[in-house]
Structure formats: C-alpha cells, structure tokens
Design a protein with these regions (language model features):
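A glycine-rich, hydrophobic/aromatic-adjacent loop/helix-cap motif
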Residues: 1-162
Length: 162
C-alpha cells in the first residue's frame, strides 16, 4: 500500500485525509511550456482560441526546515500512472516528515530542475481553473491555502493531447 501527499491539485474535495508535512514549503515554482506539444500531455488556449506563448505554473514543495505544508494524504494503487501525470515532478519519500504512520510509504512530488527552470525563464502565468480547483479542494478539507500566486492569473482552456 502506498500513499501520496497532495499539496495542490491532488487535494480534491472528498478525497484523502488532511495532514501537515513538516520541513517543506509550498511555492509556485514549476511550469510547463505552452509552446511545446507533447503527446499524452496538454496545452492551453486563451479565450480567442489562440495558444499563448507562455509557461503555465503549478505548485511545488521545497525543503524548508522552518516550514510546514497543509495537504491531504491519498491512498494510491497505481503509482506509475500518477508518475506519468506528474511528469514535471520527481516522487520522493516524505514518510518521516509526517507525524502519522500510515502503514506504507508516503510520497510527495517535487519539481524537476527543468520544470523549475521553465518557471524562472517565463513568461509565466497561472490557469484560473487550476487555482480555483486547488482553493476548492483545500476549503473542502477545512485547510487554509497559500501562497497566492504573484503571477498573472488567466482564463485558459486545457486541451489534452492524445
């Protein structure tokens, strides 16, 4: 049995158990390049149907001994499928950073260096639907959410690539 600590879009309403991850800090720090089409992934369109030449940001966690991150722990049956979804991240064992023994390893996804470089290179924006989904998930679990993005928040439509 394996578990994943969700600190962003994995913290969906009605899924998982709220817990705090000690020694980590949530940041806006990972991005995908919207100019590149990757089979099996996604890109975004603006309201006019155009494909903005931007990087689209997502949440990340970074080590910070003085911090802690609220999120949810989810039981996961297929880690390989989740690894494919979280292609901008590396899966790391954070079991020791939780004050609960769940009977199996607890993983979190931390940003890959290339995804962090895309975020820094920009121009970088946040998709409004992603931000609202994360806020709703945290509210449903009675958790506070932060930090708010210090980036433009745009109405973008997600297109999944086959």
């Amino acid at each position: 049995m394996a578990f994943v600590f969700g600190y962003g879009s994995l913290a969906e309403p009605g899924a998982g158990r709220p817990l705090r991850l000690a020694g980590w800090r949530r940041v806006w720090g990972v991005a995908m390049d919207n100019r590149v089409t990757i089979p099996g992934y996604k890109y975004f369109l603006d309201g006019a149907g155009g494909r903005p030449a931007v990087c689209v940001a997502f949440l990340d966690v970074v080590p910070d001994p003085a911090a802690g991150v609220d999120g949810v722990v989810l039981e996961v049956g297929d880690l390989d499928a989740l690894d494919a979804r979280e292609r901008n991240y590396a899966r790391v064992d954070v079991s020791a950073a939780l004050d609960h023994d769940l009977g199996g390893p607890v993983w979190a996804y931390t940003g890959l260096e290339e995804a962090r470089k895309r975020f820094a290179a920009g121009p970088t924006v946040v998709q409004r639907a992603y931000l609202e989904s994360v806020r709703a998930g945290f509210a449903a679990h009675g958790l506070g959410f932060g930090p708010e993005p210090a980036l433009p928040v745009l109405d973008l439509e997600r297109v999944d690539v086959v």
